[in-house]
Structures are given as C-alpha cells and as structure tokens.
Curated annotation (Swiss-Prot):
Glycosylation, residue list: N48, N71
SMART domains: TGFB
Name recorded for this polypeptide: Growth/differentiation factor 8
Function: Acts specifically as a negative regulator of skeletal muscle growth.
Propeptide: 24-266
UniProt organism field: Ovis aries
Localization terms from the record: Secreted
Modification after translation (UniProt): Synthesized as large precursor molecule that undergoes proteolytic cleavage to generate an N-terminal propeptide and a disulfide linked C-terminal dimer, which is the biologically active molecule. The circulating form consists of a latent complex of the C-terminal dimer and other proteins, including its propeptide, which maintain the C-terminal dimer in a latent, inactive state. Ligand activation requires additional cleavage of the prodomain by a tolloid-like metalloproteinase.
Amino acid sequence: MQKLQIFVYIYLFMLLVAGPVDLNENSEQKENVEKKGLCNACLWRQNNKSSRLEAIKIQILSKLRLETAPNISKDAIRQLLPKAPPLRELIDQYDVQRDDSSDGSLEDDDYHVTTETVITMPTESDLLAEVQEKPKCCFFKFSSKIQHNKVVKAQLWIYLRPVKTPTTVFVQILRLIKPMKDGTRYTGIRSLKLDMNPGTGIWQSIDVKTVLQNWLKQPESNLGIEIKALDENGHDLAVTFPEPGEEGLNPFLEVKVTDTPKRSRRDFGLDCDEHSTESRCCRYPLTVDFEAFGWDWIIAPKRYKANYCSGECEFLFLQKYPHTHLVHQANPKGSAGPCCTPTKMSPINMLYFNGKEQIIYGKIPGMVVDRCGCS
C-alpha cells in the first residue's frame, strides 16, 4: 500500500512538472511557425522588389531602343546641355510621374516610348566644310522618332551674344542647296529684325516646321543651314561654334510630335506599405534611383516611384478574371494558380540623352504600377 502511494505521488509530480513544459513547447512552436511565415513573406517581397528593379533597367533600355546605356559622363552632360528656355522649362516644371491612385482605369499601352519633344543638337557635316573653310553652322540628323511621327511644331533656337549699346540685329537663316549655274549655294529660309538693348545675351526661336517637313519628305535635300545675326556694325552675334565660357549655347532644334490617347477600362486593387501584414496580392512602394544605377544620361527624373506587386493569390481573392476560378474548380489539377501581377500601369515622362547625344523628352509607357491583381 505504501509503495502504491509513493508511485501515485511520483506520477502526480511528473504531471505537474511535465504538463506546463508541454504547453510552453506548443506555444513556442506556434510562435516560431508564425515568425517563419512572416519572414518568408518579407523574403518573398524582397525578391519581388529586386526582380522589379532589374526588370525596370531592361525595360527602359528596350523601350528607348538602346542596346546599352549611353556612356556619357557628367562633365560631357554639362557641356552638351543647352542653357535654353525650352529645356530649362522642361527641367524646372518637370512632372516626374503621373500616379493617380484614385483613378482605377487600366490603360491600354504601347510598348515603346511615345515621343513628345525631341531636342536635336547640330553635328559635323563634310558638305558644310566644302562650301567654306569655316562653316557657320549647322547640320541636323533626325532620329526615327521624328521621321515616323507627325511633326506639330519645329523651332530653331539660336543664342545672340550681348551688345554694349542699343542696336538692331538682322537675323537670317539660309539653307544649303546643291550648286546652281551661277554658283549659288544658299537659299533663304527665314529672316527677322530684332532690337537689342545692352545687357545679357538672348535666346531667339525661329519657326522651321515647313523646312523640317520638306527635309523629312526629301532627306537628300537636307544639306545643312547657315545662321547669321548681324548688328548695325556688321558684327555677327550668333553663337554657332561656342567659344570658352559659351558652353551650352549651341544652336539646336526643338521638335514636337503628336501623341495618340488610348481607351481605358476599369479595375481595382489593394495598396500596402512595407510594414503591412497583408498576405493577399498588394501594391507596395518602390523608388527607382537612376543616380544609384550610375545612369547620368537620364537628365530627369533622377528618381521616380515605380511600385511593385507581391502577395498570395488564392482563388478566393481572384480579382481580374473571375472565370479562372470556375476553370480551376472544374479541373483543379490541370490549371495553374493565379499570380500577383500589375493590372494597371501608367507612363513616366523622361528627359534623356540617346546614343547619338541627342536630347529626347518623351513618355515611356508602363513604368509605374498603379494597381495589382491576381490573374
């Protein structure tokens, strides 16, 4: 009897000791599972973020039709950037992106960049050198962006050096042509008279839309132009070949082309932040920093909000194509699960140098994730 009592006491003691330990182990195991799930979600989001950044690099080069990033140094950019009103306005009033989260439309989107403004700098031409020992300027090569779009505006910008006394300046733009019988090599394009006062130099724009359209129709007629801006004493004030201290004052062409609007349809999605515990498909913030890439050839924006999609796509949460849920129910083994992907993308405006050192201002489609969904 005494042995039985001792055994019972030992058994009860073991229950008292072992019981709480067992409960604590279950609690710790459950907590570890929850932490592991959260860590896996964070890791998954980090992987999606990294993949999105790499995809953006590839997309930008592809949509700009560049095989590699242009190799232009910061010093070269400072020399090439025109110090002209239209370019300063583009930079100063630059709309980094259009990200209206309240608008739930899904935009149809072309793949390649839709150019709005192209700034073309003059290049060297053997034809001009043949006409005179020191060509006065200028020969312009036109990219396919100009050739394959409707030109709505074209302006030649020239910089006139400052004057010490009030004077009248006679500006003349001449087009180089094939030699005529009398030896004539030029024909007039535009001429104008300006009154200048002492002070700083000025930028002057001249409409050359008609000439540009003719050049595009007949490329062989584009032999170059000459710029003259003579004051009352016969001094040429036009900066055609910048001297030291005149960097960024080269003549250039500003060409605007059309942009065709697209139709749209409706869609919806979830928005989250990096601290969110949402497990479903959601849009997360992501800032792309071009300076961190070493992409100095992008003038603006230096950074923009691209966003990315991440999260689970259970069929209960399916948003974009409800019929997929029915397909899965009919054949669960033969249908793949939905993925968390962008359902609404919007463009960004970009000012950049292309591979030919031309300055392009254009709209790049599909660079900002506005909505995410399961599809």
